[in-house]
């Protein structure tokens, strides 16, 4: 087994990943004879942006929708619609919401970018709320791309889907005055406000859905959402928000240009911390899920495995992935129908010292908690992360406690944190209910230099001192901060010390790669 090795996002030779449910081979692009229709690009973007004049008139906000949707609707099962560069070098298509078809693949060719409309009316579900933030919590925006009960469908290719989250809206209350991300940032200013922004991709029900090689960027809201699928393969994809088109290199935005500092007008520069609720990959109530050889940098959870209804989520594998800005490879917060049999293998996290950076995380609370069990993390390299390890049953304060979280049989083996200039060893959170203690095994978990702060005050209704209500099993390999855990902790904590070895930390010497080395659109 190979741990903490840098991989290209899409390999050129055939490769495979071994999962608990079998061997999953790298997907492949459709053969030329399987293309039912090629749809040429019509737009000429410059530096990742369409000229504002292209869709300043709301009546021309989505000129390519009909061509793309018609091609999908008329494509036979087992074939693909291919979006290609135009005859005069055009590389962009501009569309509103489109619906995928069961058995049909959308192929976005290399050099092609699908741009989303910035007209909220194109997405509005009939409530007239899309593109604003208010106290109404009802879903009001259709996603850019959607599908229901899809079987053997997918999105493949080396092209890009761009949600244009940093572009100024053209209709509604915020026309000419806010971008999608300005709207989203209002939820940061008031907990009572809901943003009404579209997701990039939302698939409900079905089986055997494939994402291969595609870049998803600048979503106004969550990027990739799945609910109730059996069989999802995401291989060699990239999720990037904000892209270089909406920021400066290194996210070095000037004061007064970002949503948190702008005064009286829309923001013109964005950072991961100011593009709220832009989750990367969210499989909910789904089984047989694989994400491999992929790259994610965003403003919220890199991954959020959820189980809020149905039969829960089980049989998940995350292998050979690179994470950058974001809130971690997470489970939760909805776990009430259960998450089980999940493996994270060969994970690399570089949090860039963001104040919101997280490594691996299981989160829930007593309003939406359930059993999370059989979760293994192995071969993890981390640096520049504020919270490298989070196992928190008190993710938010629960007024009505009816669904308690229970985290059992959690294993972390081969975890190496190389430290942070801003946060040293960062924070390690272990918090559970007395009736449902956290059961976690740590083996060869090592921090260079400063050790993580594990003893801390409680939060959101947790016990007053953490760690609390946790059974730790150490070994057989060294746990570098075990002594601190044993000396300072809250109530309900027990230790089983089975350390018999002093192995070298996981080798992270070649693990970290700049996102810009695999994507020219990346600012980092």
Segments (PLM) and residue ranges:
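Extracellular "leader-to-stem" segments immediately downstream of a signal peptide or signal-anchor
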Residues: 1-97, 101-102, 110-205, 212, ...
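Active-site beta-loop-alpha junctions enriched in small/polar residues
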Residues: 166, 229, 286, 301, ...
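Short, T/G/N/S-enriched strand-turn elements that build extracellular solenoid repeat scaffolds
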Residues: 68-74, 91-102, 117, 155, ...
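Active-site-adjacent structural elements in folded domains
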Residues: 196, 248-250, 274-277, 304-305, ...
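Extracellular beta-rich repeat passengers
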Residues: 354-524
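Structural detector of coil-to-beta-strand junctions
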Residues: 97, 144, 200, 223, ...
């Amino acid at each position: 087994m190979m741990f903490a090795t840098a991989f290209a996002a899409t390999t050129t030779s055939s490769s495979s990943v071994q999962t608990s449910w079998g061997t999953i081979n790298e997907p492949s692009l459709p053969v030329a004879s399987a293309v039912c229709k090629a749809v040429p690009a019509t737009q000429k973007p410059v530096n990742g942006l369409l000229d504002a004049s292209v869709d300043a008139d709301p009546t021309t906000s989505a000129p390519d929708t009909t061509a793309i949707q018609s091609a999908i609707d008329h494509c036979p099962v087992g074939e693909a619609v291919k979006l290609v560069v135009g005859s005069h070098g055009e590389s962009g298509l501009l569309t509103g919401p489109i619906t995928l078809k069961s058995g049909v693949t959308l192929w976005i060719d290399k050099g092609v970018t699908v741009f989303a409309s910035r007209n909220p009316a194109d997405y509005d579900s009939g409530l007239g709320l899309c593109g604003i933030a208010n106290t109404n919590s009802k879903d009001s925006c259709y996603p850019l791309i959607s599908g229901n009960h899809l079987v053997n469908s997918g999105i493949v290719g080396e092209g890009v889907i761009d949600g244009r989250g940093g572009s100024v809206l053209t209709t509604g209350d915020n026309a000419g005055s806010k971008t999608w991300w300005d709207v989203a940032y209002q939820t940061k200013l008031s907990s009572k406000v809901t943003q009404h922004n579209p997701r990039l991709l939302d698939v409900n029900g079905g089986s055997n859905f494939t994402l291969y090689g595609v870049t998803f960027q600048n979503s106004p809201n969550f990027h990739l959402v799945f609910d109730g699928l059996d069989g999802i393969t995401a291989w060699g994809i990239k999720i990037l928000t904000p892209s270089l088109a909406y920021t400066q290199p290194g996210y070095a935005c000037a004061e007064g240009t970002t949503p948190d500092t702008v005064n009286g007008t829309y923001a013109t520069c964005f950072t991961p911390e100011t593009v709220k609720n832009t989750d990367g990959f969210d499989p909910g109530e789904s089984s047989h899920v694989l994400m491999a050889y992929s790259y994610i940098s965003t403003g919220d959870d890199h991954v959020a495995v959820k189980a809020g209804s149905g039969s829960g989520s089980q049989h998940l594998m995350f292998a050979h992935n690179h994470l950058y800005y974001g809130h971690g490879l997470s489970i939760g917060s909805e776990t009430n129908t259960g998450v089980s049999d999940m493996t994270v293998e060969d994970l690399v996290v570089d949090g860039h010292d963001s104040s919101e950076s997280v490594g691996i995380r299981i989160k829930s609370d007593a309003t939406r908690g359930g059993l999370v069990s059989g979760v293994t993390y192995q071969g993890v390299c981390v640096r520049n992360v504020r919270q490298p390890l989070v196992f928190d049953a008190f993710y938010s304060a629960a007024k009505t406690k009816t669904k308690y979280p229970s985290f059992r049989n959690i294993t972390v083996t081969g975890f190496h944190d190389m430290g942070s200039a801003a946060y040293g060893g960062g924070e390690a959170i272990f918090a559970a209910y007395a009736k449902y203690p956290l059961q976690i095994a740590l083996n060869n978990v090592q921090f260079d230099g400063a050790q993580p702060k594990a003893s801390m005050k409680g939060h959101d209704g947790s016990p007053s001192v953490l760690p609390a209500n946790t059974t730790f099993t150490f070994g057989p390999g060294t746990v570098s901060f075990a002594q601190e855990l044993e000396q300072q902790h809250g109530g309900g904590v027990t230790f089983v010390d089975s350390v018999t070895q002093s192995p070298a930390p996981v080798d992270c010497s070649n693990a970290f790669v700049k996102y810009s080395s695999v994507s020219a659109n990346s600012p980092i």
